[in-house]
Amino acid sequence: MIQSQINRNIRLDLADAILLSKAKKDLSFAEIADGTGLAEAFVTEALLGQQALPADAARLVGAKLDLDEDSILLLQMIPLRGCIDDRIPTDPTMYRFYEMLQVYGTTLKALVHEKFGDGIISAINFKLDVKKVADPEGGECAVITLDGKYLPTKPF
């Protein structure tokens, strides 16, 4: 039976335990996701408390991380999503995304509405991918793909 969580702390505590086990075992998120049939980003999102994993995937990652049965069950429960505090992020990486939306948010909104009309980009029917690519000027760049279904506003 599908179960749901009403308290974000239990999943955040589990995420802390998962990250500790991941570090002790020297595993990458890609290695943990391997064999689940799910995207690395989706499995990572679940391990950090923002998604529910199917039972088979939860058992597989649970075995890789030496999680107990209760933790494996928690990974399958629908979480209380959106655990970022209602304040400006202080973590430098998360702040840069906040900053990007502050700078480019109105541009993204204008371009999306111009190309699609009034509506939103789904965060439910959504895919996320992060790639590291060489910068022709030296160093490396992050290519972040946000792929969400467009949902038009419907008058009623």
UniProtKB/Swiss-Prot annotation:
Q: What gene name is given for the protein in this entry?
A: cynS
Q: Name one Pfam family in it.
A: Cyanate_lyase
Cite the active-site annotation: 96, 99, 122
UniProt keyword terms in alphabetical order: Lyase
Q: Which GO terms describe its molecular function?
A: cyanate hydratase activity; DNA binding
What EC number(s) are associated with this protein in UniProt? 4.2.1.104
What is the recorded name of this protein? Cyanate hydratase
Asked if the keyword Lyase belongs to this entry, the reply reads: yes
InterPro entries per the record? Cyanase (IPR008076), Cyanate_lyase_C (IPR003712), Cyanate_lyase_C_sf (IPR036581), CYNS_N (IPR048564), Lambda_DNA-bd_dom_sf (IPR010982)
